[in-house]
């Protein structure tokens, strides 16, 4: 099923994190942690403005991942991890900061999602046979301690594909689609 996410259509200047969190009807503690993470992300992006190509896209990616995971009834730790993952992916925070600011559980989830990114070493443009790709998928599932990492990574890939439509050249779009088709779509099917 394909759905258009509300956050995907928002004008970033008009986005109000408190209203958005309220619209999700989350428990108060989860809502507060997401709001705090949003402002944390904004501060980290501002600190690294010189190396950020598209700060708005980074923030929107976290919001959209949270929406996807919320629809899947994922827990508050998963939602918080999703909000923070774009910071990790863009290397705007280090592990000590995450550990100090969000604790060991969130740090472990973020590391698990980041480890799944190692799969990109198998370039979609290389002609891998079906058994090689299947072995890679099995390796992905085996290397994570927490299944939530896989779900969060799948949400991240969905947002990645949506962003690719507007920000990639045709060749990059094809490579992104092949990667998701070969690795992540069958992985999602297995779950």
Describe each model-derived feature in a short phrase:
Residues 1-191:
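Active-site helical microenvironments for divalent-metal-assisted chemistry
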């Amino acid at each position: 099923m394909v759905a258009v996410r509300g956050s995907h259509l928002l004008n970033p200047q008009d986005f109000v994190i408190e209203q958005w969190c309220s619209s999700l009807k989350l428990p108060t503690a989860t809502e507060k942690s997401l709001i705090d993470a949003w402002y944390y992300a904004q501060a980290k992006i501002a600190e690294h403005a010189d190396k950020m190509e598209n700060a708005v896209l980074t923030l929107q990616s976290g919001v959209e991942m949270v929406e996807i995971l919320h629809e899947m009834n994922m827990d508050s730790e998963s939602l918080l991890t999703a909000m923070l993952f774009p910071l990790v992916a863009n290397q705007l925070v280090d592990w000590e900061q995450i550990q100090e600011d969000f604790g060991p559980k969130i740090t472990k989830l973020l590391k698990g999602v980041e480890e799944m990114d190692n799969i990109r070493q198998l370039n979609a443009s290389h002609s891998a046979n079906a058994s090689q790709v299947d072995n890679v998928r099995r390796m992905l599932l085996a290397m994570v301690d927490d299944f939530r990492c896989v779900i969060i990574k799948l949400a991240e890939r969905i947002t990645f594909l949506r962003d690719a439509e507007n920000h990639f050249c045709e060749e990059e779009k094809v490579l992104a689609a092949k990667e998701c088709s070969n690795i992540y779509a069958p992985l999602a099917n297995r779950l």
